[in-house]
């Protein structure tokens, strides 16, 4: 006979079992972050702010991370820092970010100070440093910079490449009158001839094309050892608490990297990045004679690891840090490997050895 009216004890037991079954789902939902905070180590342009030059920029402009979490009710917040890498490090130290896009040297500086993060993937690699001077300047080469007023944004990944380029020419920062300026201030100072030279990035092409500067040096022409790398990192605490979220963020950025690396999209890519305020022509110049797959590869290959080890060693040699930084174990490739497999991209990007030569 069917018991149509269960006893109070049986009803209580049924409710208790139901609540225990439901509890893990409720707990898991409550454990999701309300917002994913991604720091960007540069000043954004526009409203809302955007940036360019990397697969992370593509992901932000195409809202790939936002689309990934649209059905979860999780917001994605991109936070831009005029103070670049050093300012991002401060935000990381204050637990104000979950992820960050920044350059190699700032991350090494943070690690030397005990900030615990994991490097998830490369966002842009083999990026050159440019040195520009006023158009009527008599400066023709790095050797001519001795005793000149030169702006360098210290603590960013521009600094170390510039220091190595100076060393190759028998100079150091002490041989120059170095002025520490952020990117915007440096561009303004160069345009007004308030300085004799500026160490910068692709933004210097805009001044050149406007007739306000000439570029006397591009570090990528000296080989991959004179380039800078950027990455996406995650804070240790966030990764331990939300590995599933980390995986999905990496999935989204790998999608952006694949689209950005497709030569069929070169024109569309530079037009997309031009929304950041950097002209299309500047991106053309910055990526001239380089394959998109080489510049926008997310791979954690021997070349990338070697460059971070070199940055750590050079930073110690130049006394930018006080103690050695261990790079081994800093990278966490499992999320990238999962994304590459899921998107059938295991062999899409070429891998390079520590010296920058293709692996067979």
What is the role of each PLM region?
Residues 32-56, 74-80, 147-151, 177-179:
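Short, well-ordered beta-strand elements
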Residues 179, 185-277:
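Pocket-lining segment of extracytoplasmic ligand-binding domains
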Residues 101-113, 163-164, 168, 195-215, ...:
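A ligand-binding cleft/hinge motif common to bilobed small-molecule-binding domains
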Residues 134-149, 240-244:
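Flexible hinge/capping segments at coil-to-helix
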Residues 45-76, 112-113, 307:
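Short, polar/charged alpha-helical segment
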Residues 78-90, 103, 171, 176-191:
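Short helix-initiation/N-cap motifs at beta->coil->alpha
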Residues 44-46, 50, 241-324:
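Secondary-structure end/capping motifs
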Residues 313-360:
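Conserved C-terminal helix/tail region of periplasmic/extracytoplasmic solute-binding proteins
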């Amino acid at each position: 006979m069917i018991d149509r009216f269960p006893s109070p004890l049986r009803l209580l037991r049924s409710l208790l079992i139901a609540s225990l079954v439901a509890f893990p789902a409720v707990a898991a939902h409550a454990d999701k972050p309300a917002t994913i905070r991604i720091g960007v180590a540069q000043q954004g342009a526009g409203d809302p702010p955007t940036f360019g030059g990397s697969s992370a920029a593509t992901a932000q402009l195409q809202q790939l991370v936002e689309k990934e979490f649209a059905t979860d009710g999780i917001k994605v917040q991109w936070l831009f820092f005029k103070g670049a890498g050093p300012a991002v490090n401060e935000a990381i130290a204050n637990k104000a970010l979950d992820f960050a896009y920044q350059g190699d040297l700032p991350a090494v500086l943070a690690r030397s100070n005990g900030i615990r993060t994991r490097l998830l993937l490369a966002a842009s690699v083999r990026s050159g440093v440019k040195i520009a001077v006023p158009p009527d300047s008599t400066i023709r080469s790095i050797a001519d910079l001795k005793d000149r007023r030169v702006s360098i944004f210290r603590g960013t990944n521009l600094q170390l490449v510039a220091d190595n380029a100076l060393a190759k020419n028998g100079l150091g920062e002490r041989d120059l009158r170095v002025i520490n300026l952020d990117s915007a201030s440096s561009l303004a100072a160069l345009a007004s001839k308030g300085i004799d030279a500026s160490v910068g990035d692709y933004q210097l092409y805009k001044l050149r094309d406007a007739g306000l500067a000439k570029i006397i040096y591009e570090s990528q022409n000296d080989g991959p050892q004179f380039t800078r790398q950027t990455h996406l990192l995650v804070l240790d605490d966030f990764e331990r608490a939300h590995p599933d979220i980390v995986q999905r963020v990496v999935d989204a950025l790998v999608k952006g990297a694949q689209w950005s690396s497709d030569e069929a999209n070169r024109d569309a890519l530079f037009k997309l990045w031009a929304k950041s305020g950097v002209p299309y022509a500047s991106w053309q110049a910055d990526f001239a004679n380089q394959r998109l797959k080489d510049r926008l590869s997310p791979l954690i290959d021997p070349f990338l690891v070697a460059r971070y080890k070199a940055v750590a060693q050079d930073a110690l040699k130049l006394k930018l840090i006080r103690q050695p930084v261990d790079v081994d174990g800093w990278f966490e490739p499992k999320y990238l490997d999962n994304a590459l497999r899921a998107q059938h991209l295991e062999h899409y990007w070429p891998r390079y050895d520590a010296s920058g030569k293709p692996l067979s």
